[in-house]
């Protein structure tokens, strides 16, 4: 990349021809589909032609080769031109482009990873640059390889705050292997973009965030070649002045054409006009990459030893998480940790102390942190663990949702769950997160109740596909499991039982310990209860729950430091629905809480040992 060598006129003309073929393919595909975004594709035609057939280094028949340059189409609605690129490169049959958006085709309306050339799903705007930052960070600091990362954004999505979180991150970590291309085509979906073509303001904003920013004519292949050839020791933003619908007579730079395919007759005429400008049908071959990315194996990463806790000793699961993650970090140099400036209360600082080169401080930008993790995880380069207060993951729900669509393997640990955090009050209390994470299609939801099982959860999460969420607690609680206890995803544990149990009580985290304390109270009254630890709330151990319920006259009592909606109670109710003779009673937080001591709040909201004991008595009396 050092120095710029101007392409000769033949190469420049070939790039112009390529751009026009990409335009034609985008128009043909969207017209055949009867939907799509041809105007958004046409503004980016020269950008995509120069990127893929002059600048980028990749193996066209092996899109996910670890040595390849990376590309993220943040403006995912321009998917047809991405598909056209891979047809131009010879990876896709050109005829397949006409199956765009059909249920029988892999060419969805927006990019998805069932396409071999798509690392992450895009289409929810504002997220691509954060993912690209994760890829670039991995390339520079973990792989130490020469591959570069390119991200194409639309001007409409530059109103998203997450874009600027990513801009700040890239500057802080000097990601000079990252190039963002801003397709400034002036028009948004329903109105012009706020800055329209005020290119100097875009440039000043990028420069203020610590980027090298250059303005180019986005329809000049020569200017684009020069801009991409300028290596800088900082991230680069290429601010391309373009026109939406470029090349479409009567549509170019006109409002009200967003997301509208051209009618067939109009498309045929426009295609003839564009085709007449093409001088050669000869295609440009992709330039292969430098093969210097290390071989990586992230399969079957195991703890180097068993846990070393003593039954009865006390530790908060949030601290046990930090210790466990640091321990797992010794098993593989591909375990990485990310945090949102909460590394002291989440205890990820323990990992940072032991593995400083694999800790990424993302600061107070949780949306971007999740996107960074998704980027780091692409092509199976790392196993990322993100941590912050669980309440703050709620603002990143769209990123988490898109991570699932991206088939991403990331691990999220949320601490400070429920009213049991005490005096900090409701803004810090995660009371919705079980509902949130249970709703994600690829999720596994861990809810550890002591130090031993927290360590097991971390190990299992590292080896479980999809989005893993570990819900940790602030209070210190006793170790209840032996160090050699085996745990599996979807396998609950009976923590307390007798042959005379009358109610099955299911609690997790703090409330499991309250249930055990309630059992001691009830034992004095000659009332025995069975206490279950679900371990994973998703998937739930339906068989053990049903077996326990049938052994306790069909009575189940759930108790949780969470709102009623979407938590353990509703998960258990869903699992046993339709089973004859089984009833489920819920104890949960029923309103927005307040500050107070943990014990006071557990009592106020009816989820402490006394409330559990009272509910058990009521169930027995009712019978």
From Swiss-Prot:
SMART domains: Transket_pyr (SM00861). One of its GO terms (cellular component) is endoplasmic reticulum membrane. The active site is at residue 366. Keywords: Acetylation, Calcium, Isopeptide bond, Magnesium, Metal-binding, Phosphoprotein, Thiamine pyrophosphate, Transferase, Ubl conjugation. The keyword Calcium applies. Mg(2+) binds at residues 155, 185, 187. PROSITE patterns: TRANSKETOLASE_1, TRANSKETOLASE_2. Homodimer. Catalyzes the transfer of a two-carbon ketol group from a ketose donor to an aldose acceptor, via a covalent intermediate with the cofactor thiamine pyrophosphate. The modification Phosphoserine is found at residues 104, 295. There is a cross-link at residue 352 (Glycyl lysine isopeptide (Lys-Gly) (interchain with G-Cter in SUMO2)). Thiamine diphosphate binds at residues 40, 77, 123-125, 156, 185, 244, 258, 392, 428. Substrate binds at residues 37, 258, 318, 416, 424, 474. PANTHER family: TRANSKETOLASE (PTHR43195:SF3). This is Transketolase. The modification N6-acetyllysine is found at residues 6, 11, 144, 204, 232, 241, 260, 538, 603. The modification Phosphotyrosine is found at residue 275. The modification Phosphothreonine is found at residue 287. The modification N-acetylmethionine is found at residue 1. InterPro entries: THDP-binding, Transketo_C/PFOR_II, Transketolase-like, Transketolase-like_Pyr-bd, Transketolase_BS, Transketolase_C, Transketolase_CS, Transketolase_N. One of its GO terms (molecular function) is transketolase activity. The keyword Protein transport does not apply. It catalyses: D-sedoheptulose 7-phosphate + D-glyceraldehyde 3-phosphate = aldehydo-D-ribose 5-phosphate + D-xylulose 5-phosphate. The record marks 37, 258 as: Important for catalytic activity. Binds 1 Mg(2+) ion per subunit. Can also utilize other divalent metal cations, such as Ca(2+), Mn(2+) and Co(2+). Belongs to the transketolase family. It comes from Pongo abelii (Sumatran orangutan).
């Amino acid at each position: 990349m050092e120095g710029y060598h101007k392409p000769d006129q033949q190469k420049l003309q070939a790039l112009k021809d390529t751009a026009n073929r990409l335009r034609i393919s985008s128009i043909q595909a969207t017209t055949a589909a009867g939907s799509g975004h041809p105007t958004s594709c046409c503004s980016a035609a020269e950008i995509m032609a120069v990127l893929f057939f002059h600048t980028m280094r990749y193996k066209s028949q092996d899109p996910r080769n670890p040595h390849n340059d990376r590309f993220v189409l943040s403006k995912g609605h321009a998917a047809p031109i991405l598909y056209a690129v891979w047809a131009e490169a010879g990876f896709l049959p050109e005829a397949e482009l006409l199956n765009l958006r059909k249920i029988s085709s892999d060419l969805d309306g927006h990019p998805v990873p069932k396409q071999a050339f798509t690392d992450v799903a895009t289409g929810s705007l504002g997220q691509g640059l954060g993912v690209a930052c994760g890829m670039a960070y991995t390339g520079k600091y973990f792989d130490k390889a020469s591959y570069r990362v390119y991200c194409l954004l639309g001007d409409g999505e530059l109103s998203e705050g997450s874009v600027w979180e990513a801009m700040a991150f890239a500057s802080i970590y000097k990601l000079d292997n990252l190039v963002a291309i801003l397709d400034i085509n002036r028009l948004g979906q329903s109105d012009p973009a706020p800055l329209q073509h005020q290119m100097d303001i875009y440039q000043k904003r990028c420069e203020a965030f610590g980027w090298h920013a250059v303005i180019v004519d986005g329809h000049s292949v020569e200017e684009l070649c020069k801009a991409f050839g300028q290596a800088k020791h900082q991230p680069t933003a290429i601010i391309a002045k373009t026109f939406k619908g470029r090349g479409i007579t009567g549509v170019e730079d006109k409002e009200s054409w967003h997301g509208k395919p051209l009618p067939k007759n109009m498309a045929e005429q426009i295609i003839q006009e564009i085709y007449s400008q093409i001088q050669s049908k000869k295609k440009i071959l992709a330039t292969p990459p430098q093969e210097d990315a290390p071989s990586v194996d992230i399969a079957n990463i195991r703890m180097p030893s068993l846990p070393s806790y003593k039954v009865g000793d006390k530790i908060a699961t949030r601290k046990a998480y930090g210790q466990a993650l640091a321990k797992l970090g010794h098993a593989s140099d591909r375990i990485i940790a990310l945090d949102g400036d909460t590394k002291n209360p989440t205890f990820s600082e323990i990992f940072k102390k032991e593995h400083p080169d694999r800790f990424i401080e993302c600061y107070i930008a949780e949306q971007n942190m999740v996107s960074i993790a998704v980027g780091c995880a692409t092509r199976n380069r790392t196993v990322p663990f993100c941590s912050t207060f669980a309440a703050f993951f709620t603002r990143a729900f769209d990123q988490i949702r898109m991570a699932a669509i991206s088939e991403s393997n990331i691990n999220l640990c949320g601490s400070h769950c429920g009213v049991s955090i005490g005096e900090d009050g409701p803004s810090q209390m995660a009371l919705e997160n079980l509902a949130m994470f249970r709703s994600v299609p690829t999720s596994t939801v861990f809810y550890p109740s002591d130090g031993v099982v927290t360590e097991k959860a971390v190990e299992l999460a590292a080896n479980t596909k999809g989005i893993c969420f570990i819900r940790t607690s602030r209070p210190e609680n006793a170790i209840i499991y032996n160090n050699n206890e085996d745990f599996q995803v979807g396998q609950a544990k009976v923590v307390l039982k007798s042959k005379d149990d009358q109610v099955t009580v299911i609690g997790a985290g703090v409330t499991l310990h309250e249930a055990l304390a309630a059992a001691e109270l009830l034992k004095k009254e000659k009332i025995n209860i069975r206490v279950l630890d679900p371990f994973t709330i998703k998937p739930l151990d339906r068989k053990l729950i049903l077996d326990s319920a049938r052994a306790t006259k069909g009575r189940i009592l759930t108790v949780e430091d969470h709102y009623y909606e979407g938590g353990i109670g509703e998960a258990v109710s869903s699992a046993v629905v339709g089973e004859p003779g089984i009833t489920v009673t819920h104890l949960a937080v029923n309103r927005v809480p307040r500050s107070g001591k943990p014990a006071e709040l557990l009592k106020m909201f009816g989820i402490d040992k006394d409330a559990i004991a009272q509910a058990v008595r009521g169930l027995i009396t009712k019978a």
